[in-house]
Amino acid sequence: MTPLSTVVRAPATIANVGPGFDVFGLAVDGFHDVVEAHEADGVRIVTEDPIPTDPERNTAGRVALRMVEEFDLPGVSLEIRKGVPMGGLGSSAASAVAAAVAIDREFELGLEESELLRFAAEGERAAAGEPHYDNVAPCLLGGFVIWRFEREYVRLEVPGDLRFVTVTPTGVRVTTEEARKALRERPPSLDDVVNNLSAVALMVHALHEEDAETFARMVGWDRISEPVRKRFVPRYRELRETAYGTGALGFAISGAGPTVFAVCWREDAEDVRTALEDVLDGKCVSAVHRVSDGAEVA
């Protein structure tokens, strides 16, 4: 660690969490991006990972540029170590959130959560072309987050006996832009919207009641994005059937994909992970996750 620097770890996230399109997000442990910030001239990106080092094209760099400009800072160097797989687990959000928190702490800005979220979401423009809060909010705050506006969000606790199994197929890339364009090609019907609204309401109620099973089951009730985006996931139907057949309570696409995730009881999680890996002949990155408490200073 560089002297007089600040190091922050930010976790992977599952956006949408099934039917909660652009509204729900969940932070999970196991995968993290690490950003180290220290004062420098201008804004510099240092990394050994295959990501852009031009600050305008890097999510963490975008955050730094905006914060340096707004607070008249001398400049900052960001060393980025990527640990979140790309493809539906909030990789760009993790770097953006870690950068915002690291710069805030390094320069003792004392920003509120809402301000950190604003800067982190601005960083998402580099990856997605527009701010997306359903990844950055849970990444910063931890837990399960319901998002509406920049200053209007709720964090809820997820029952501790649930596990989240993520599987990211290798060699498959889906951009957020592609995934959103696909949604416009098939507008949801009224029945689809009603289905998702009821599932979303039941998920929130289940969390308040600490009803883990209902929460997990409703994850698999997306009728807006899944029918369109499943084509981006290799062997999606087989993955879904295998997950449920091995004990999963819920199954859905994580964010824009191609990552998928299953919600399971703790004792079933490893069996589900192994079975899903087998469907893809091991050509994937998989993990079993607990819920994360969000970004933290290392």
UniProtKB/Swiss-Prot annotation:
- Superkingdom is Archaea
Q: Please provide, alphabetically and separated by semicolons, the GO molecular function terms listed in this UniProt record.
A: ATP binding; homoserine kinase activity
The answer to keyword Transferase applying to this record is yes
State the organism named in the record. Methanopyrus kandleri (strain AV19 / DSM 6324 / JCM 9639 / NBRC 100938)
Key word Membrane present in the record? no
Which NCBIfam families does the record match to this protein?
PRK01212.1-4 (NF002288), thrB (TIGR00191)
The record's EC number reads 2.7.1.39
Q: What is this protein called?
A: Homoserine kinase
Which HAMAP family does the entry link to? Homoser_kinase (MF_00384)
Its family remark reads: Belongs to the GHMP kinase family. Homoserine kinase subfamily.
Alphabetized UniProt keyword annotations: Amino-acid biosynthesis, ATP-binding, Cytoplasm, Kinase, Nucleotide-binding, Threonine biosynthesis, Transferase
GO annotation (BP), single: threonine biosynthetic process
